[in-house]
């Protein structure tokens, strides 16, 4: 049995920590991969490269091992996480948890603690851990603190258990939490928490148990020198005191930080020792010295170590005192800065001195002894001194200068590196301690690299110049001395001396210059010139020397030899029959490589530098190309010239010597020899001339082509030195191309007969031989023999001439003549050895046969037969292959295609009422040509046979003029196809041509229309038969039979006469479609395919029935005429073995005529619309050919659309109702389909007429206006038409024919008419309400679907019509001195039509959609107030109620309720009248806005799966009127109050569902209207300005509609926003007197209260308070007499800003309360008056104080007790007035004191002090005024009941002090005034800035 205890949450946390650790390691491995696996070599030598490769391999092995370890780590974490989950699952399933729950329940309920169990760990920052169980249980852990917050204390244990650990302190120095107390009897105290980063103190350990259990350990101090926590005390008997926490390291810095002190050990118990003190922290490291300059900076001093903690007090009886803590170690000194690179003339700077190590920390005192038998504790040991800092590295020497390019000069010497810095002194320890060791000396700087030698100059006309030598590398810097050890203690080691630097690398030698190219040959066929040699590369520079023990620099690399010049190109051969191209020139020799530089010498014990590598020899020049042979336009081409020899390669440079004086170092490697030049390419042979072409129309043979010239031989490759690579031989030249054979002449056309044959093509010329390849160079390795040149391409054979075209028929109806035969193609030319033969010429194409003539018009003569096509020409043979492996015989030529047969002539068109003529037959296609033969290669295929000619189209039948139309003519037969040509030896025979397509039968003529009003139309003519398809040759494809002609369309019936509404005429029947032609017979062979039968013609469409006549006024419309019957489809064409054609489709029945429209009512109800005509029956489908499918029957005609009902008349007089609209006409029945056809759909019912509008109201009997008339009811929609032959109710679809027919769908019921709009109420005194809107018409019933004859599914019945929309209610009249009238109620929506009944197997139609209720009318606007002292505005009218939605039929969708009307706007209050001497009139109060109308109720659902309608939306409340402005008076008057916003309308109730399921959603309530703005206060006239008026209250939101059974209640609207308070009036200026003070500004008006929301709605926001008025300016002081001038007046105080309005309260439920309004801005204080000039002068007046900011409005209260809305912010304080200027005088008066700012949101700036007066006497001096104090910030608005208090505003800035007065002549200037103090922030606001002092005055002269 296991005794291991597992805490699953700890295991899960450990798995998470391991996951993070694995991610960190993986990221570190990835970042280090590139640096560790691709190690760069320290030098260019082989040893450095091998070492780098070795360490790179180690890096790769590490990465591979890391990948395996990461995979194991991932599997381990996965197993750990899985185990934690398993333990957690086992705990959850264990019975222990259930038993503990039963045991702990009573004590948990009574005392708040369990009986058994651990306390919970805290989760919130700084939270305390939970207490353990009363009997058994450990305390929970405290949570870590937030930044700057102390960690939470650990929870206490019960009787038996350990205390919980304290939480860690937050970053920024937070103290760790104290550990929890151990159990009352047994248990260890919890450990204290770790202190937060930034020097936080660790938490104290918890006390132990009474009987047994030590105190907890103190927490470790926070990073940055935190002090450790005290250990917990032991309790009575056996527990030892806890150990103190350790201090932490001090942070780094210029001087390292002091380490943290160790914590005090805990006191022991009666029988137990005290705890040990904590160890002190290590001092921080000193900062590094700065880099750069001639001398690097000195490193910083290390920090002092922390003192160890004191041991705990010993036990009362037997325990010893605790041991003191170990002192902290001193910090390490900083590293010295690196010396700058090359700062003193190029020499590197000396490294800086290392920093001094830190002083060691003191040991902690031992713990005191106990009372009886215990001893004191030992003191802690002293810490170790810090190590001195390392000296800085010396700077690198500058590199030597590179020599200029193309000069060959030696590079400059590199500069010496700087010396390393001295190591720092070790830190001191006190007696008994250990001193710190000295720092290591710095590394010497690296010597500079030598400069690169200059490259040799290129030579455009000779040998290239040699490159210059590289410069010598610079010497390395000396290493720095080690630092001294510390003093005061024992130990400490002198620092190690620094290493010497590395000597500089020698410079690279310059590259040799390139030699110039040889001259090209100028004379025809001459040899090109030899190229020049390249220059030698320069020697590498010597490496630099190093100091003792250092590493020398490596020698420089020798320069690369210059490249040899290219040989000149040979001349081109002359243009003559024997001209040969010239030989190319020899390439120049490459330059020798430069010698490697000597390695640098080493000091004693050092490593010598390696010698430099020798330079690479230059590449030899390429040989010149041979000249091309001459072309010969009239004979054989010339041979190409031989290519030039490649140049020899340059020798490699010698390796450099090693350095002296030390060990190691390698001799430089010898340079590589250059690569020999490539031999030149042989010239191309000239092309042979082409054979002459025969003349066109001559039928002659074309001339043979001439042979091409031989290609030139390739040049030899250049020689290489020992070890070098030889040049490759040049490639041989390509042989010339043979000439093309001439084309054969074409056959002549024959205008009177058959065409002539074309001539044969000429033979192609032979190809030229390819040139031999060049030899390789000698002396080295490698090099390739040049490739033999390619033989030329044989000439192509000439193309055979085309046969001539045959003549067309010479007269009307005569046949055309045959085409001529195509000529044979010429043979291809033979290739040379290994070449490619020419292809045989293509055979000529046979001529096309002539077209037959067109038959004459009139009675319709037949067309002529087309001529046969000519045979295709035979193809030429391919050329013979040349000798060799790569030879390829030529392909045989392509055989000519046979000519196409001529097209048959078209039959003549029939005259009116006569048939058309037959089309002529097509001509036969020509035979294909024979394919060309080839000796060994691929033979050509035979030519394709010509296609047979297309048969002529039959003539079109004549159109009927007084009767039936004529039939169309029969189409001509297609021509037979030509045979395919025979293949060449091994080639495939050509494919036979395709048979010609039969001609298309002519279309039948259209029947005549009816001859008069209401008469029937005539039948259409029959379509002509299609021609038979032509037969194919052996294996060919037959032509398809011709398509039968389409039957003619029947004539349209005439339209019925207007007036009383006559019926329309019947449409004529459509003509039958023509029969299709038979397909052609298949040819002999496996691939033969018989032709398809032709497509049968479609039957003609029946004529459309005539439209019924329109009814006269108040009469019904006429019935529409029936549609004509469709024609029968044609018979499909037959085929012997292939696919037979399908029969033609029957014609569509004609569409029934539209019923006539009912007449409009003039004095009453409108007339009904006429019934629509029946649709025509469909034509039958044609029979199929042998094996073919019968044609589809046509579609039955659609029934006519019923006529629209007439519109009802409007009301006959003022205030009377309108009349009803007429009923819509019934739709016509759909036509029946033929067997298998598709029936026509029933016609749609007509739309009901719209009801008439009510008449407008009038003034009747005095001041009241008349009510508006009610709108007329809309007419019902017409029912759908009947199907064919079915009497009675319902617009049924047609029945299906026998077979797989599809019955027609029932018609759709008509839409009900829209109700008329109610009349508008008249403007009156008082105003009148608007009339009610008319109800919408009911929708028509859907038609019944057609019946299927097979007993299968019948057609779907028609949908019911939609109900008409209710009319809109009339708008209320505007008030004229009174309240506005209310809007009329919207009309009720029409009920939906019932869906059509289902037939056997069919689907019933859907019910229509109920009509939407009409919109309620808008209320009228209230009138403005009367012109009086307080003329209040009138209220707006109430919005009309929305109409009720129409009901749906069974299963339909109900109409939505109408939207309530908008309430009218309240009238504006009048401005107050101007006051008399005493007081002005007050502004009038704005009128209240009208209440929004109630939304209409939604329609109820029909029985079944109906969807009830949504309730209407309540109307929006009207806006309140604005208050009038107060008059300017004495005193001035306050502004009027704004009117209240109207209340939002209530939402409509949702429709009820008849099935008991969910009903529709109810409508949303309307939004409340916005409150009106308060009026502005009047300006003061010798008094204080008037206060602004209060803003109007926002309207309450409308209540959401009540829910029906199962439905959803509507949402409440949004409460209206409160109006803005008016602005206060401005105070008057002061009176003209000695101290005329200005008057105060008026107070801003209070913002209006926000409207309340309904249940669950959103409240309106409170209005914004008005701005306080500006204070008046003080008057200037009066001019003084001889004694004293008058003082300037004080500016008036600014008015106080208005209080923000309170936000609306939330409705019951999930409502959102409104925000409080924003307080108004305080008014600006007035400016103080200027002091008068006098003797002495008078002080300037004091500036007025700024007005206080308004208080923020209170946030709305939430009814649910949850968070309420935020309160408004306080207003900003007004700016203080400016102080007056002091008067000029004798002894200067003090400047006026700046005004004090008012309290407010953002305090205003204090006024500036006035300037001091000028001195009065030579000894006097003025005193400046003192700047005003900044205003205090206003208090923030109070928050709602659950949100707390808002922040106060910011304090204002203090005013600036006044400038001192200027002294009189001989006097002294005044002193500068002091700046004002900044205002204090209130409730969280920031204080303002103090003002600036003034400038002193200037002394007098």
Swiss-Prot record:
Keyword Nucleus annotated: no
Entries under InterPro entries matching the protein? PE-PGRS_N, PGRS_rpt
- Which positions, given as ranges, span the membrane? none
| Assigned keywords, A-Z | Repeat
Lineage: superkingdom: Bacteria
Instruction: Report the residue ranges that make up the PE domain in this protein.
Output: 1-93
Region annotated Disordered, chain positions: 146-175, 249-289, 577-626, 915-934, 1116-1135, 1254-1288, 1311-1355, 1415-1440, 1461-1495, 1519-1560, 1620-1645, 1666-1700, 1724-1761, 1809-1901
Query: Which residue stretches does the UniProt record annotate as biased composition, category Gly residues?
Result: 915-932, 1116-1133, 1262-1288, 1311-1322, 1330-1348, 1535-1553, 1740-1758
- What family is this? Belongs to the mycobacterial PE family. PGRS subfamily.
Q: What is this protein called?
A: Uncharacterized PE-PGRS family protein PE_PGRS54
Q: Which organism is it from?
A: Mycobacterium tuberculosis (strain ATCC 25618 / H37Rv)
